[in-house]
Structure formats: C-alpha cells, structure tokens
Amino acid sequence: MIIRDEINNFLEAEFPQINGDYEIINFSNENISILNHISQKHLRPGGTVSGPTMFALADVSFYIAILANIGTHRSVVTTNCNIDFLKKPSPVNLIAKPRIIKLGKSLIVGDVFIYSEGINEPVARANLTYSYR
C-alpha cells in the first residue's frame, strides 16, 4: 500500500482540475474515507447535492482506493459505474467510503457508500468496475 502523500501528489499532478474538491480524511489498509467539499456549485434546485456531484465522488474515491492498493498506475480506467440514490443528501460536505471487493488480474470490482457529513445513514451507494494493466 502506498502512502497518502504519494496519492495526493499524483492527483495534484495528473488531475489539477479537482484540486481542493476532495480530501483524504482516513487512510489505512482497510479503511479509506474521502471528503468532498460541497459548495454552491454542487447544489441543485431545492438545496440538495446534485447527482453528478455524488457520481464524481464515487468515481474519485474508488480510484483513490485502487491507487492505494496497486500504486499510481495511469492505465486504470472506469469500465462501469452504477449508483443508487438512497436518500436526499443534506447540503453539507459528503464523505465516501470505498471498498474493493475483488482485485483481479485486469479488473477491480467494488462499491462506495456516500454519506452526508454527520449523518450515519448513506445517501447513495455505487458499484464500480475498473480495468487496469
């Protein structure tokens, strides 16, 4: 497993467009949590966090979990992502908890639960598959 600083440096260099949006708040062998800093640009009418914001958080957080396990390979790509919106999220920061279920030779399968900060029930659940070489 690589260290948090390596992942942060990689993301800053390769994905400067997301700098400041996401923060790794927990980073250990079995437990990674990513905070999405929510601002007005992430809200939709009705004062709730938009679906595309939650989808992006699921994708980014699972990507970080993969990097933590296999290193900063640039040939890692999303091949599938399905998301279930379970509950209206509060207009606060979101926390994603990614989990790798299977790390195969060329595919990685897992899920991500997304929570409104300070609330224990998930607001969304995503299932993801990535391809890598």
Label for each model-derived stretch:
Residues P52-T72:
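Active-site helix/loop of acyl-thioester processing domains in fatty-acid/polyketide metabolism
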Residues G20, E30-I32, G51, S75-C81, ...:
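A generic structural signal for short beta-strands and their flanking turns/coil linkers
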Residues N36-I38, F85, Y132:
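Hydrophobic residues in beta-strands and at strand termini
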Residues P89-P91, I95, I101-R133:
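HotDog/MaoC-like acyl-thioester-processing domains
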Residues A65-I95, I100:
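Hydrophobic beta-strand-centered segment that forms part of the acyl-chain substrate-binding groove
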Residues S39-L57:
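A conserved, well-ordered hydrophobic junction motif at loop->secondary-structure transitions
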Residues M1-L35, Q40-K41:
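Non-catalytic linker/capping segments at the edges of enzyme domains
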